[in-house]
Amino acid sequence: MFFKKNKKKETSSMANGEDTKKLDKKELIDEAENLINTIDSVSGDERIKVLNRIGSLYFEADKIDDAIKYYEISISENKSLGKAYTELVKLYNIKRKEAISKKDDESMKHYIEKIDSLLQLSKDVIRGRV
């Protein structure tokens, strides 16, 4: 009576057999490339949104280096904490872990320094120095 589990109702899409699958890697990369072609035609906050979207698409497609590139551009143009900042921390940690597994000390140090610079940026933003 009190601890009965509620049964979830099937949504209409599940009942129809439709899958709400993610886009495959090729579609993600194609969408990112289409957005890259529009970067020069936008400016300000819209440009930052496009750069972040490109980074996000590449991240979903497991193109880590490309994702890092566009998030870094976004951060360099708009020094604020947000999606680009949090995603870059994740990406740098992924690259750092890869370097550790390959026993590549130089790459590991490089990504630790990148993470440190992001932490410094966050301190500067919070203190109003940027």
Positions of PLM-derived features:
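Conserved structural position within tetratricopeptide repeats
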Residues: 37-41, 75-76, 110, 117-120, ...
